[in-house]
């Protein structure tokens, strides 16, 4: 992998991680377009640069992470994914291919549109991340565990789960952002540890480049998304997922 490719993948990761359009799916698709093979080493790179996106959330929400009651909710939501991710690690890795990504992009897009249409004239009961009940936090975590299939979108699954459970768009998005921290940190740490012997000096340099670029890109993406959903629904993201999935299927 070249430094330029690391920069491109870092931008893709940072811009898509917290949008409901599947960062993993985009990384796989872009890697294929760049002619990069999906080796175990490259898969580890894709997961590892997510650390940059994680730190962007920590940077923006640092004070909220110091709230004990809020962190209890986040940790409860993390439990389903933490357990299933550890148990199903090898199976999840075997699913990293473009065809599964295309299917999940289209399916997830349709689901996102249907959920928004269903909630079009309904009010939301929960308007703050501090108000999310523990049982609903756990259920959002269950939704997140479904997103272990590439192309599903972790943020998309948690946002859909939040909307179905009565969270408004901003609350669902912010809870999704914060839940990403323990989830992605554990996934990143585990992948880097398992593949540490496969990285040479050049690989580590590319990891650092991808990490920094992902961090900067994620800062912009998070701020933009919160501003966008204050006046718009998630339907445009659903349409985007469907179009992207169809175009890539036709091209591939």
From Swiss-Prot:
GO cellular component, one term: plasma membrane
Molecular function via GO: undecaprenyl-diphosphatase activity
UniProt EC number: 3.6.1.27
Subcellular location: Cell inner membrane
Keyword Lyase: no
Taxonomy, superkingdom: Bacteria
Bilayer topology: Multi-pass membrane protein
Keywords linked to the UniProt accession: Antibiotic resistance, Cell inner membrane, Cell membrane, Cell shape, Cell wall biogenesis/degradation, Hydrolase, Membrane, Peptidoglycan synthesis, Transmembrane, Transmembrane helix
A Pfam short name: BacA
Transmembrane segments: 1-21, 42-62, 74-94, 95-115, 172-192, 206-226, 232-252
Catalytic activity reported: di-trans,octa-cis-undecaprenyl diphosphate + H2O = di-trans,octa-cis-undecaprenyl phosphate + phosphate + H(+)
Keyword Transmembrane helix: yes
Main location per the UniProt record: membrane
HAMAP family for the chain: Undec_diphosphatase
Other remarks in the entry: Bacitracin is thought to be involved in the inhibition of peptidoglycan synthesis by sequestering undecaprenyl diphosphate, thereby reducing the pool of lipid carrier available.
Family: Belongs to the UppP family.
Record's function text: Catalyzes the dephosphorylation of undecaprenyl diphosphate (UPP). Confers resistance to bacitracin.
UniProt-recorded name of the protein: Undecaprenyl-diphosphatase
Species whose genome carries this gene: Sulfurihydrogenibium sp. (strain YO3AOP1)
Taxonomic lineage of the native organism: Bacteria, Pseudomonadati, Aquificota, Aquificia, Aquificales
């Amino acid at each position: 992998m070249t430094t330029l490719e690391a920069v491109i993948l870092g931008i893709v990761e940072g811009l898509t991680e917290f949008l409901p359009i599947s960062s993993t799916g985009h990384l796989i698709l872009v890697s294929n377009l760049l002619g990069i093979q999906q080796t175990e080493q490259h898969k580890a790179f894709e997961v590892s640069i997510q650390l940059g996106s994680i730190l962007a959330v920590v940077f923006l929400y640092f004070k909220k992470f110091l709230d004990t009651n809020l962190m209890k909710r986040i940790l409860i939501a993390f439990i389903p994914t933490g357990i299933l991710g550890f148990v199903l690690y090898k199976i999840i890795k075997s699913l990293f291919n473009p065809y599964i990504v295309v299917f999940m992009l289209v399916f997830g897009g349709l689901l996102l549109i249907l959920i928004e249409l269903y909630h079009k004239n309904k009010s939301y009961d929960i308007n703050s991340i501090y108000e999310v009940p523990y049982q609903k936090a756990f259920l959002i975590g269950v939704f997140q565990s479904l997103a272990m299939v590439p192309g599903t979108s972790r943020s998309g699954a948690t946002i859909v789960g939040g909307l179905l459970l009565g969270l408004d768009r901003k609350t669902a998005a912010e809870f999704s952002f914060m839940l990403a921290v323990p989830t992605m940190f554990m996934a990143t740490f585990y992948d880097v540890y398992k593949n540490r012997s496969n990285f040479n000096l050049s690989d580590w340099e590319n990891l650092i480049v991808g990490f920094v670029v992902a961090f900067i890109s994620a800062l912009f993406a998070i701020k933009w998304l919160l501003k966008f959903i204050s006046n718009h629904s998630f339907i445009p993201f659903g349409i985007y997922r469907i179009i992207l999935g169809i175009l890539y299927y036709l091209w591939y």
